[in-house]
From Swiss-Prot:
UniProt-annotated binding residues for L-aspartate: 118, 122-123
Protein family according to the UniProt entry: Belongs to the argininosuccinate synthase family. Type 1 subfamily.
Disulphide-bonded residues: none
Keywords, ordered alphabetically: Amino-acid biosynthesis, Arginine biosynthesis, ATP-binding, Cytoplasm, Ligase, Nucleotide-binding
Binding-site list for L-citrulline: 86, 122, 126, 174, 259, 271
Organism: Leuconostoc mesenteroides subsp. mesenteroides (strain ATCC 8293 / DSM 20343 / BCRC 11652 / CCM 1803 / JCM 6124 / NCDO 523 / NBRC 100496 / NCIMB 8023 / NCTC 12954 / NRRL B-1118 / 37Y)
GO biological process: argininosuccinate metabolic process; L-arginine biosynthetic process; urea cycle
Pathway, per record: Amino-acid biosynthesis; L-arginine biosynthesis; L-arginine from L-ornithine and carbamoyl phosphate: step 2/3
Residues engaged in binding ATP: 8-16, 116
Name of this chain's protein: Argininosuccinate synthase
Enzyme Commission designation: 6.3.4.5
Length: 408
């Protein structure tokens, strides 16, 4: 009896040549395509291609809503930005892809799961770490990494096994895309001194060509999650799609930075994440209005750790679950509306309100005579606030000189 294997299939050359190779190795291949919002992909054609090149079964799963609700929403609530810039675009889809692959493997009594990652990147770790966590007994195949095929060798193998070679094979870029953004690397981008050409971008307009008039949008949040755009209630999936389109035409969401990869090397990455730039800026602004000071000061520490965990393939981990429980507890009062100004590559919060959860008290904050703040109480507060430092300094004189005793 032939063993069954489940393949994470994209329709590209790497995973297409993997199918006949895995068949030659003795597997019946189930090719799985996960729709997480890839731009401009005909998934029906990809499904048919998998069958044409030898897959026993080809499955397309529409996972956009689940991706938005279960994976993007936590990133928004936790303001997750790896190294302060990367909104977890590719890293975010991997846990969901693996979850679906493992489920399908179990449903079909498969003994192995395969992916098309190379040995240079983070994805091999993300795929295999999640597989090990969800099913330690599952065998893993990684033909592209394990045999280190060159592009020329892949093309030759494809031609020998009647695998169609994509017409865009001469593209210099390696692209990964989902609902939350687009990642681009390789080619001319590998030299960090080369400015990214315009053909490296697809979701955003060049700032020079962006509209000369700003656009304003209102984003409504409930428990830290966007739920409405300009007053219209939308699913998170549809809201992200809408904001991507609006913000993209204003040149918002381009990221060009040097990234510290999980495998220990630095890489130059180009990202486009228009909705992420707008929604995360709006969310942080609303938190400034609704979070208590100690929580607001401590939360960024947790946010950074969560970003590292997601990037480093530890979405399935007890620490991630524990830290997200803290994040969820902070978001119950993050309710309100933020007005965003979109203009020439910038997404700026210009107004905000929270009817029931705002901690801003205009009567206390005003500098007019109508202020209800008791300024006289400040004198005693300051003395008590600085008491421990005052005592220490007067005993040790680290920053001051001791007073000389005068004898009369």
């Amino acid at each position: 009896m032939t063993d069954t294997l489940v393949l994470a299939y994209s329709g590209g050359l790497d995973t297409s040549v993997a199918i006949p190779w895995l068949k030659d190795k003795g597997y019946d291949v189930i090719a799985v395509v996960l729709d997480v919002g890839q731009h401009g992909k005909n998934l029906n054609e990809i499904q048919a291609k998998a069958l044409k090149v030898g897959a026993k079964q080809s499955i397309v799963i529409d996972a956009k809503a689940e991706f938005a609700d279960k994976y993007v929403a936590p990133v928004i609530k936790a303001n997750m930005m790896y190294e302060g810039e990367y909104p977890m675009v590719s890293a975010l889809s991997r846990p969901l892809i693996i979850k679906k692959l493992v489920d399908i493997a179990h449903e079909n009594d498969a003994v192995a799961i395969a992916h098309g990652s190379t040995g240079h990147g983070n994805d091999q770790v993300r795929f295999e770490a999640a597989i090990h966590a969800l099913d330690p007994d599952m065998k893993i195949e990684a033909p592209i990494r394990d045999f280190q095929w060159s592009r020329e060798e892949e093309i030759q193998y494809a031609q020998e096994h009647d695998v169609p070679v994509p017409i865009d094979l001469d593209s210099p870029y390696s692209i990964d895309e989902n609902l939350w953004g687009r990642a681009n690397e390789a080619g001319i981008l590998e030299n960090p001194w080369n400015q990214a050409p315009e053909d490296a971008f697809a979701l955003t307009t060049a700032i020079e060509d962006a509209p000369d008039t700003p656009e304003f949008i209102d984003v409504t949040f409930e428990a830290g999650v966007p739920v409405a755009l300009n007053g219209e209630v939308l699913s998170l999936e549809k809201l992200i799609v809408a904001v991507n389109e609006i913000a993209g035409k204003h040149g918002i969401g381009r990221i060009d930075h040097i990234e510290n990869r999980l495998v220990g090397i630095k890489s130059r990455e180009i990202y486009e994440a228009p909705a992420a730039a707008v929604l995360m800026t709006a969310h942080k602004d609303l938190e400034d209005l609704t979070l208590e000071r100690d929580v607001a000061h401590f939360k960024p520490i947790v946010e950074q750790q969560l970003a590292n965990l997601v990037y480093e393939a530890k979405w399935v981990s007890p620490l991630f679950d524990s830290l997200m429980a803290f994040i969820d507890s902070t978001q119950q009062n993050v309710n309100g509306v933020v007005k965003m100004k979109l203009f020439k590559g910038n997404a700026t919060a210009v107004a905000r309100q929270s009817e029931h959860n705002s901690l801003y008290d205009e009567d206390l904050a005003t500098y007019t005579s109508s202020s209800s703040f008791d300024q006289a109480s400040a004198v005693g507060f300051i003395k008590l606030w600085t008491l421990s430092n005052t005592v220490y300094e007067q005993v040790n004189h680290v920053h001051s000189q001791a007073k000389k005793n005068t004898v009369k």
